[in-house]
């Protein structure tokens, strides 16, 4: 039992060390269009339990990557004529479909052969190519994925996100061109899962004959790995584009200051339900499948809903906003005296309130520092932006005195890496004090 507790504490320590020693970013990583040259190829991804998994993926043609998981986030503007030129070096035909986009035209690619598939035109195996063109008519968060043998090819990693920014208002800070969809920071949450046994079966057949399409019984599929943006926790907390994860460039570390608005672009690219839980506050769901939740044109998201868990469904996308101020916690989160000036977005009703009282006139006091064990993300004080010296032997990695809340799948087995906790579909949101720069 003590050994298990030690391993858990050690794993949590490593996770917090990675989070707190590296910067996050508040701009979604991706490539700008409207013309994209992609390739479908094979490679390996790493999971945080130390495993290496054979996978397929889309990547930018000409890049040094053997593949990318998930595929590059494609970023375009409303009204753009979008063209995707796909080349294929996999031993199977591959295609692309774009849920939410209308009148997609598929044609022969830039040199390789293509053929008609069940759903759309496909790039032939090994040397094929195909092109897709459509007009991005509506802003929002979308996905793209293989349209060929989807039960296997999406599982293998042929999936990615598509973001269409509005043509009006402030496209970088309004998700749908309406003031009520404004945000300060945006982050992508592409949710997926894998069964490593399926990947091992495909890999073994490729080692025998890399030119022949694999055959796999997908009825035996059982997921044991869960991802956000192609990484399992705690790797979700690493910086983007770290060199030891060359095929998994995207991280997920949302950060904001009190009173600011964070936009979550959530893409469910898998096949299981993933109830995504946001500790700290409810999210406001403003759009689903790239369509703002409004009752009539021009009203904005008047049908938005508030919840503490986004009930994500396979194939759907969601846009939700998250805010945090500390209002109503029962004390002044900044530790102000009554006459001190207000912080930006601070609740005046809470200003100057002492740390919570256990009964009228008797304030709650924390145990002596020598009598407690603090987590590494705890600054030593309950006040935002403040810190106290840790006790002897205690590691403290909260650089700015921020508040940390875990965001994760509420299906508990999905926050493991092949049954090793903590891991899987999990990250942290960081409430930073004002004055701390969020890139």
Where are these regions (language model features)?
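Compositionally biased low-complexity segments at domain edges in trafficked proteins
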Residues: 174-211
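Divalent metal-coordination and catalytic microenvironments
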Residues: 38, 84, 96, 146, ...
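Non-cytosolic beta-sheet module surface loops
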Residues: 76, 86-90, 136, 266-268, ...
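N-terminal, post-signal-peptide metal-ligating segments of extracellular/periplasmic oxidoreductases
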Residues: 10, 24-131, 204-262, 295-300, ...
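Bacterial N-terminal signal peptides
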Residues: 10-21
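Bacterial N-terminal signal peptides that target proteins for export
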Residues: 2-12
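Short acidic, flexible loop segments centered on an aromatic residue
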Residues: 98-103, 273-285
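Extracellular/periplasmic metallocenter environments
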Residues: 90-94, 101-105, 111-172, 302-439
